[in-house]
């Protein structure tokens, strides 16, 4: 720039000879800055939808330009229904953000989440796992540390350990049934999402810490359990804004202080529970035996973080699966009649229902699988990041650094994978030729690969035992007001559902 031009600019901006000149100069400077900013955003947007390496993958244009589209739907709770419709409109490969692509083919499970011999693992290097509110645990760490935590925890979820834990499981189920009989005798209509949460939180509390929360005994949520359910929803919000670290702390100030304090309280409660567990002598191998064993050398924050994850992952999701199975059986009277017949002709009394005998209930297992398909407990995307250098996913080249994933709800409800995907049809799991083209490998409710849910055996056992016992004890139907339970559910990483009111009638024997 010439000396003359520099002098003109200097005078335009810094000349203070008159107030009018100052005002004009300020307006000019502000306008220039705004124009530069707007022009930059427009150019970035054009680049992202035309020249960006992911530009060839279809999806909403706004999503290709800015992640705000994705974050908005995370916060409103309609994310999985929006993604499902987008997959229907754009196809099996869907761009949902400038740097994120989703898939709905079963092959993508292997490419993204499966073991990758000779290739680096697709890490959980995303705000969902690395955000400031994420605990340090088996879910969030990578590599050798994850494998170490998994080896320690696996012993508590082994078949041998589950056999040792069965008396604890049966005791909690007996109490659930007893309480439901009392509710029915008092003329009440139980809200089953709450009752299933009471049971699963009490059970995981006893298996992890050696003591229940007293939810079943007191017929209401323990304050800590209520807080956990709220914290889970807030985690979805922090996930949404975690993509904007430069404004994260500002945005968090808009979260009510009482809700922010729940994170701190949750950590304190976890710490106190762990301490009581460490002071106890448990006479069976529970879920935390190896975590608290000094010989394994874990730091206290590692023990607390993994215990916190056990409580959250081992309770609400199982309760959701139980609620979904009970609900969808009311939507298919033929399936309901079949599962009732199977259970009530297999057992002579409630005492016959145990961890061994429930394995012969093939139709009940099909009902569970179908409920897990149509209403997966973890319906959203649990993303991974493509390693540097890029890789092929389902035959598509994806650049390194891109977030990729599968939304369970979307892959399970896709017409590309299932006949009548929105219908609850247990027979699709029993060899019915009508559904022989179904891609059952697409359904992975407990995730997939070396980082799948370590507690899936416990969750399935709980479901079989609870459902078999309830169906043995009661006839049931939906109470008025719960007909749209599925349609009214929202997703904040996990489901947020309306009350599920069930009218129970004890079986006369």
Swiss-Prot record:
Major location (coarse): membrane
Keywords from the named record: Glycoprotein, Heme, Iron, Membrane, Metal-binding, Monooxygenase, Oxidoreductase, Transmembrane, Transmembrane helix
Pfam families according to UniProt: p450 (PF00067)
Family membership: Belongs to the cytochrome P450 family.
Cofactor: heme
Claim: Nuclease is one of the keywords in the record: no
Gene ablation phenotype (knockout): Impairs the production of 2-oxocyclopiazonic acid, but accumulates cyclopiazonic acid (CPA).
Molecular functions per Gene Ontology: heme binding; iron ion binding; monooxygenase activity; oxidoreductase activity, acting on paired donors, with incorporation or reduction of molecular oxygen
Protein name in UniProt: Cytochrome P450 monooxygenase cpaH
CDD domains referenced in this protein's UniProt entry, alphabetically: CYP60B-like
Localization terms from the record: Membrane
Gene Ontology CC entries for this record: membrane
Membrane topology reported for the UniProt record: Single-pass membrane protein
Source taxon at top rank: Eukaryota
């Amino acid at each position: 720039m010439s000396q003359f031009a520099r002098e003109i600019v200097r005078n335009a901006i810094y000349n203070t000879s008159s107030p009018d000149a100052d005002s004009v100069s300020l307006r000019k400077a502000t306008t220039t800055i705004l124009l530069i900013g707007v022009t930059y955003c427009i150019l970035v947007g054009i680049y992202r939808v035309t020249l960006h390496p992911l530009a060839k993958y279809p999806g909403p244009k706004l999503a290709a330009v800015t992640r705000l589209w994705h974050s908005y739907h995370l916060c409103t709770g309609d994310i999985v229904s929006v993604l499902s419709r987008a997959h229907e409109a754009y196809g099996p490969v869907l761009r949902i953000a400038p740097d994120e692509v989703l898939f709905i083919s079963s092959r993508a499970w292997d490419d993204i989440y499966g073991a990758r011999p000779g290739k680096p693992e697709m890490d959980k290097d995303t705000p969902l796992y690395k955000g400031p509110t994420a605990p340090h645990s088996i879910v969030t760490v990578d590599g050798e540390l994850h494998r170490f935590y998994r080896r320690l925890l696996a012993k508590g979820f082994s078949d041998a350990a589950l056999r040792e834990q069965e008396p604890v499981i049966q005791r909690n189920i007996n109490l659930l049934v007893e309480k439901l009989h009392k509710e029915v005798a008092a003329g009440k209509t139980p809200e089953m999402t709450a009752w299933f949460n009471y049971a699963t939180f009490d059970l995981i509390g006893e298996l992890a810490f050696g003591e229940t929360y007293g939810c079943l005994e007191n017929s209401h949520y323990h304050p800590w359990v209520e807080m956990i359910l709220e914290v889970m929803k807030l985690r979805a919000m922090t996930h949404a804004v975690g993509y904007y670290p430069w404004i994260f702390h500002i945005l968090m100030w808009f979260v009510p202080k009482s809700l922010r304090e729940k994170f701190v309280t949750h950590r304190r409660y976890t710490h106190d529970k762990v301490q009581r567990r460490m002071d106890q002598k448990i006479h069976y191998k529970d879920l935390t035996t190896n975590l608290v064993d000094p010989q394994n050398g874990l730091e206290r924050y590692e023990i607390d973080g993994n215990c916190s994850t056990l409580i959250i992952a081992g309770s609400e999701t199982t309760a959701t699966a139980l609620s979904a199975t009970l609900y969808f059986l009311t939507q298919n009277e033929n399936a309901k009649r079949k599962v009732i017949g199977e259970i009530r002709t297999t057992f002579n009394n409630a005492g016959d229902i145990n961890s061994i005998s429930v394995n012969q209930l093939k139709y009940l297992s099909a009902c569970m699988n179908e409920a897990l398909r149509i209403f997966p407990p973890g319906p959203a995307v649990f993303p991974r990041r493509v390693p540097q250098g890029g890789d092929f996913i389902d035959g598509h080249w994806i650049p390194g650094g891109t977030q990729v994933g599968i939304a369970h709800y979307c892959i399970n409800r896709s017409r590309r994978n299932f006949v009548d995907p929105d219908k609850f049809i247990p027979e699709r799991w029993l060899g019915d030729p009508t559904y022989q083209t179904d891609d059952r490998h697409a359904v992975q409710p407990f995730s997939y690969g070396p980082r799948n849910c370590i507690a899936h055996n416990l969750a399935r056992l709980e479901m079989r035992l609870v459902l078999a016992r309830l169906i043995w004890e009661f006839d049931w139907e939906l109470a008025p007001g719960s007909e749209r339970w599925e349609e009214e559910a929202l997703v904040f990483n996990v489901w947020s559902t309306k009350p599920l009111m069930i009218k129970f009638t004890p079986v006369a024997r």
